[in-house]
């Protein structure tokens, strides 16, 4: 979420929804507490720890990374506040919860970014995926590989019906990641948000559980 920045730019994560509460109604009362760390062919997806403060300060402090995100580049205080949130985001127990995992290389342990899955609705079984790539490790498909694992968790672990991805419409590189995940572009919303002093367009992508399983 500029072509002059990372080759695989971050998708724009939404602000906190503030949704909480017990599940009631005619839908599954499921929770997702993954057995961390998760492993893919090349990556390890693990919980954040306070030891990640320096790397979070580094990559989230770069203007090219945050250009299409809601927040400004992190300073020391913002990085500390972020770590306080990130270390707690290890499970989805209620709507509004966020699962946010650090992504590292399995062979070397190098940090390559983070991915997140937000449980947006239990009643409608919906979620939202997001990611932020470390600009020193773009162009290798790491974000796509990690995000695919979170789609699997959302559909197979939490039994979601639909997962969306939202991004600044100027972020062509991030749109390509979503397309590689099999997500379809459903909307282009004109000047629907005022972010960092300007009206911005938003693109919306989505994938249904049956589409995910058919492509598996």
Stretches found by the model and what they are:
Residues 2-136, 153, 157, 191, ...:
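GNAT-family acyltransferases
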Residues 49, 113, 171, 180-182:
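Conserved phosphate-binding and hydrolysis motifs of nucleotide-dependent enzymes
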Residues 131-133, 139-156, 172-180:
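Conserved acetyl-CoA-binding loop-helix of GNAT-fold acetyltransferases
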Residues 157-166:
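Conserved GNAT acetyl-CoA-binding A-motif
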Residues 167, 174, 186, 198-201:
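Short histidine
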Residues 179-189:
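Conserved acetyl-CoA-binding loop of GNAT-fold acetyltransferases
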